[in-house]
Amino acid sequence: RKPGGQPGHRGHCRKKLTPTREIYLPAPEEVLHDPDFKKTSKTITKQKIDISVEVHVTEYHADVYYNSKTGERIHAPFPQGVIDDVNYGGNLRAFLFLLNNDCCTSIDKSRRFLSDLTDGKINISKGMINNLCRSFAKKTESQRKEIFCDMLLSPVMHTDCTNARVNGESSYVFVCAVPDGGVLYFARGKKGHDGIKGTVVEDYQGTLVHDHDVTFYKYGTGHQECLAHVLRYLKDSMDNEKGRTWNRQMHSLIQEMIHYRNGLSESEEPDPQTVSEFEERYKTILSIAGDEYDYEPHGKYYRDGYNLYKRMKKYKKDHLLFLHNCLLYTSDAADE
């Protein structure tokens, strides 16, 4: 479908905010000079919402006192965090930290963006921005330990491993997320079992939702394959194997199952008869896939569709677990 508003759908109107300033417009000239116009009880209001960026500089002055007998010099203590001649406040530091990490903006772009916003008044060094992560990790150590323990008790956890670069070297980031919003990131030099050591996954005893990284199958007590990934793989097969029918049928079935599952309330159990019918259709489509690949084997340069078929056949239970477990989501979007 095309981006933007969809025909036949109710639009998402912009919400008005509490005004910070009100301007009453004067009556039009023709109203002032025509006595036939009478003021009604109706008033039309329209809002223009904007933002502004201001630099706030608080300068502290502390007089120095000298003791002529002892030679001692003292002054009033400065507030906490005011140590150097120039110090940056928490709002500014948090802004740069989120810009650099949550918005995935480089250090150079982050400092340049801040400089542009403040008309060049604030130019922060790269080193200071780089140290924000270390400072954040140190200050949140107790919170991260608490989240770690809470995650171990969650019945469902989403996990993923993605590539990254640290100081120009290839690295990996393991992500662990639970439905209530808790998320932890673990930087590792290796993937596989070595990378999982020290993460929540290592000692987790619940159900894991993940893509088809077989390493994760050694952990947890249950597994749900990320169906968002599966749908993308099926779409790729549809684009590259246009003569096959199983991929289109399976794509449609998975969408139908997700729609059914999402339509259930939190307290509502899936209907056993409906689930059984879904499972039979799943097996039938895989049988069709087997016949199609027997009749026309996969090509030399594209075998992803065939590999997907074999995977969905071998790990059938892990693709359909969400039909039996109401706590599961059908994708690992939480960790994405």
Give names to the regions the model predicted.
Residues R1-D84, N130, T159:
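Short, flexible loop/hinge motifs at secondary-structure junctions
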Residues Y329-D335:
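Conserved small/polar residues in nucleotide/adenosyl-binding loops
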Residues S52-P155:
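Short, positively charged, Gly/Tyr-enriched micro-motifs
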Residues H212, T221-Q249:
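Conserved beta-strand -> loop -> alpha-helix junction used to position metal-binding or nucleic-acid-contacting
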Residues Y66, L99-S106, S170-V183, V230:
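Short conserved beta-strand segments at catalytic cores or DNA/RNA-binding microdomains
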Residues T118-I122, K126-D213, G222:
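RNase H-like nuclease fold core
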Residues L253-L308:
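Long, amphipathic alpha-helical stalk/connector segments used for oligomerization, subunit docking
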